[in-house]
Regions:
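His/Asp/Glu-rich metal-coordinating catalytic cores
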Residues: 49, 58-166
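N-terminal active-site segment of His-dependent metallophosphoesterases
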Residues: 1-69
Length: 168
């Protein structure tokens, strides 16, 4: 079984801090093309799943172009399961603009959510589980104590963000 893991792609980033408008536009296109190439490569290689561990986008205001390209890529590859954990830069940005989610797009929430990768069962009937949670200021202090995994499965845990520690 083959799985692709990625994070911090930051599609639709303004890139205005260090680049000219022309270079920023060029880089923005390159990022979207690279994401397309990754998905195409996955399909060609028989990848079962693509795990996106946060910050697929860089803004809450995703362009229609980027949203449609990503949605069409996901829908156009129904044999690949996409597991999308939103990060601190893309909360709700992609999914809020969709009238309905592609069937092969699996999302995580503020509580632990697990999905079993189909076709990965071992002799005991257990397979690969992809488990994740979107960290928030409200859950980040206690969520780790609530993780429960099946020891008979191969478990992949997906998180994004670092914990902010405050002194004083």
């Amino acid at each position: 079984m083959k799985i692709i893991h990625c994070a911090d792609i930051h599609l639709d980033s303004k890139m205005s801090a260090n680049l000219t408008k022309e270079k920023a536009r060029e880089r923005k296109t390159e990022l979207l093309t690279t994401f397309q190439n990754m998905v195409t490569y996955g399909a060609e290689q028989g990848v079962a799943a693509i795990i996106i561990a946060g910050d697929l986008f860089d803004t809450k205001n995703v362009s229609a172009t980027a949203r449609n390209v990503v949605k069409d890529l996901i829908q156009g590859h129904p044999k690949i399961a996409f597991y999308y954990l939103q990060g601190n830069h893309d909360e709700g940005s992609f999914t809020s603009g969709l009238s309905e989610l592609p069937e092969n797009l699996h999302l995580f929430g503020n509580n632990w959510t697990s999905y079993e990768l189909s076709g990965t069962e071992n002799t005991s009937g257990k397979g690969v589980a992809v488990t994740g949670v979107e960290l928030t200021p409200e859950n980040s202090g206690s969520i780790y104590n609530t993780l429960s995994l099946d020891v008979d499965q191969c478990n992949i845990v997906v998180l994004h963000r670092s914990e902010e520690r405050r002194v004083g």
